[in-house]
Amino acid sequence: MPADYSSTARALALPISPLETPSSPDQHVERPPWSRRISSNVRRANNSASPYSNQPTTSFKDQILRKAEKLQRKFVSTWQKLSPLQKCLAVGAAVLNIILIALFLVYQHQIFASLAPFAERWRDMRGGWMILWAMTFVAAFPPLIGYSSTITIAGFVYGVPKGWAIVASATVAGSLCSFLASRTILSSYVHRLVGKDKRFEALALTLKHDGIKILCMIRLCPLPYSLSNAAVATFPTVHPLNYALATALVTPKLFIHVFIGSRLGSLAGDEEMDASTKLINYASIIIGAGLGATVGYVIYQRTMARAKELEIEELEAANGDVAAGRRVAAEYSDANNDDAALMNDDDISLWDNEDAQTGYTDFVDEDEADVFASGDLDEEGNIGGKGKTAGT
């Protein structure tokens, strides 16, 4: 029996589970694939699947139908928000535009004939081009309007080569001066004017990555001329000389407006023009206007798509930095726990006294007296003996 008690005590003293060993520094836990950032190469490879991809995932016809439905819903929602007075004014403006277009088509010859002498006197005036140059220059400052009209007048009065040279030089100079003024003396007004415009907020992010390229795209977008000058001035990463360079690089787009003006001048100056020539001029005007609007719209869509793509990349980079910081903090915490375990295992107390009486332990030394040799049985025997003695 004592031997059985000793073996049982030794068995109970054994640990139930193996001791944890400190993690090896060579072992690294591999992160799951979903936690990794998408590289730029993979993103470009899968760009067609992105909602902001420049490549259409549907047919051109479906895109046109979708755009038409979107415009219809927007028109209906806007119309429902108008008050009765606003609806009456909107209907009146639409009717007035139809009447003006009809009058222009009917009396176009008389209108152009009355404008022809005026254009001729302006063209023959000494220094007359400076008036047009000044008009284009002033139209660059916010919130003035009329920039497109001045370009068309340049083509109407001076034709394609000379008219383009006048408005191109005035555009570059006016844009630069408007940029500097919007960043200095007009800064508070500009921030109130365009500071909360979502279009320009989206374009601000792209300038951090694409530089002169995105500046050229902004200049090609069909945005209000004076407002775009003011908005770009609020972007701190844009240098004035870079902005002037981008404006100069996109001045060839002015040929479209100048060409339309020159065709109008031809219709006004030649009274004996036959029907076929007039038809060609009108077709040229319509094609030029449609081409300019289409190019501007496509560039605007691609610019905004690029802005959304860069915004997603910025968010991914920020989320990746946060995840990396949390992972490093977790690894640091695990390392501290491992060091503490090692210190506890190797801890040697300098105050141990082998002669002192130790406390309770589950381990039994065979050399020591068997603690179960005398115990409850002897005590019960003694009690039983005393009982018998008392009974006798």
From Swiss-Prot:
* Superkingdom of the organism of origin: Eukaryota
Recorded hits in Pfam families, A to Z, give: VTT_dom
* UniProt region (Disordered), positions on chain: 14-37
Q: Name one GO biological process term.
A: vesicle-mediated transport
Residues exposed to the Lumenal side = 1-87, 148-163, 262-278
Spell out the subcellular localization from the entry: Golgi apparatus membrane
Task: Please give the residue ranges the record annotates as the region VTT domain.
Answer: 155-264
Give me the glycosylation sites of this protein: 46
InterPro entries to which the protein is assigned, alphabetical:
Golgi_membrane_TVP38/TMEM64, VTT_dom
The residues that cross the membrane are: 88-108, 127-147, 164-186, 241-261, 279-299
Cytoplasmic domain ranges by topology: 109-126, 187-240, 300-392
Keyword tags: Glycoprotein, Golgi apparatus, Membrane, Transmembrane, Transmembrane helix
Copy the domain comment: The VTT domain was previously called the SNARE-assoc domain. As there is no evidence that this domain associates with SNARE proteins, it was renamed as VMP1, TMEM41, and TVP38 (VTT) domain.
Q: What does this protein do?
A: Golgi membrane protein involved in vesicular trafficking and spindle migration.
State what protein this is by name.
Golgi apparatus membrane protein tvp38
Recorded source organism is: Botryotinia fuckeliana (strain B05.10)
Q: What's the encoding gene here?
A: tvp38
